């Protein structure tokens, strides 16, 4: 009873102005009517049916000098003492002062089997939800700078019809989206309602101000997913009256990336407007993420936001951007801190649909980590040797929100004992599984390549290669690529995913064969030249495809950079060495067909070598270098063996294809080619 009295006294004190009088809610104050000062919502606002707009401003009469750009200039109080449940109210109550903080231990999140508490519990895989992940209680104040940033994020939602069209079209066409579509679509409806309410408000600035306060208070609450939550109701925990900043940041990230891929074509007049929109969405996503790090403990929504922000930054800033690598570090840290890398043992307090969503999130982050580590020649951030997370089941997005579906039982007639769907369907989870399997072998290859060659390396690499081939052959037949995979009766994304998966699979073999070849052997070996030729022909086959609804140029550009350059470099250097030295050419296929493919590849490079292309400098240098070498190869006259390779190349190809660090492009000007990806 004494504690209840103390809490009531503190709450009553928080609702008073500095002059000792009780504060009125903003609606009563503006209408100049008597307020009963009830918390969290006054009875007058309840009677009028405007409870959602009832809030107590910390400094209602404070106004910045000059033009009022952002209505909240004093900072906003937020209380991190409670956990939000489905039945709890999140109506914000702001205070005039900061009450003394009462501290609780800050628990570190997931604690594994070697942690300091492992000997005290039978459950080694401690659930982050059971630990609470609580932080200091009592009221704190979010600085005005971040309050203004949240207002800017909300203003970025101004043209919500464009955002909604971009996201819906992205999910309609994409086979690589990670977050299940029902979670996003249900959230869109709620955020759209907020935007409509703001437009219809009598005072736009005041509504934005009250909405900002409400979102700050909601986001500051510890995000808890009750075990009884159903997938169809999951969005209600972070939308509507409980709208959180994380989901707004996710929506901005998805819209920015969809815009980059030229979706919602009628909404944009030019490439410049698309670039500006993508940059605006990235700025909003960055601001949302940084503010969430201040306001709330780590949760699943935070990981959604970090991942989507990383993907948007990847296309906006370029794959070699320091920002991308830094964000990947954040994502891996958060995944380990929340325990997504470990499969729960025994009973868990996490709903089944959320466990499956976490498996999808981990699989997507794992393969993205391997791609970036390969491209940049750096150690991966999420090594498999410390993880045992199961692959996601090959089920539809809609299955996650279906009633009565057991996601852990393969006997339900949907998936087989290996987790693959039994109906031969193309689903987003199918490609997550395929790319995850390929990435586990890439993980092993990276570990060997970054450690350096040893006497036992050959045996290890051959074993990895054999297991990788066996894994590919064991995939469901409809998910494996063949030259006839491109079927006009199927959506473009369904046709693209087998090509991308096949290229990732071939890249594993390419890396292995390059490591097995002698370091400075310009001839390569038959296996290396063969896989390089397969990669090049697959890249060129992608270049022949056309799709009226999707601009494939962005995908083709990235494919050339990631796969075309390395394979073409190996082949053209081997041809040049054969021309100069007269030694046998180890390629077992048709030499003339290979030269034709290289000529077509050079033609693609030249086609991208125009000032309007963001990678203009890179493609121009590459086309010039490759063209000179092809001219030398086709020239009937002989060339002295001692002629320096650098005389006809703008790249140092010996370094370029030196796979010790898997750094194919160490001599290229990434500042021009990638860091300004959209400009």
Where are these regions (language model features)?
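Long, amphipathic alpha-helical regulatory blocks in the mid-to-C-terminal portion
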Residues: 218-230, 276-304, 327-346, 364, ...
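Short coil/turn connectors between adjacent alpha-helices in alpha-solenoid helical repeat scaffolds
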Residues: 262-277, 314-328, 520-524
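Intrinsically disordered, low-complexity transcriptional activation domains
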Residues: 3, 14-20, 95-96, 100-109, ...
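Extended catalytic-interface subdomain
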Residues: 378-389, 398-449
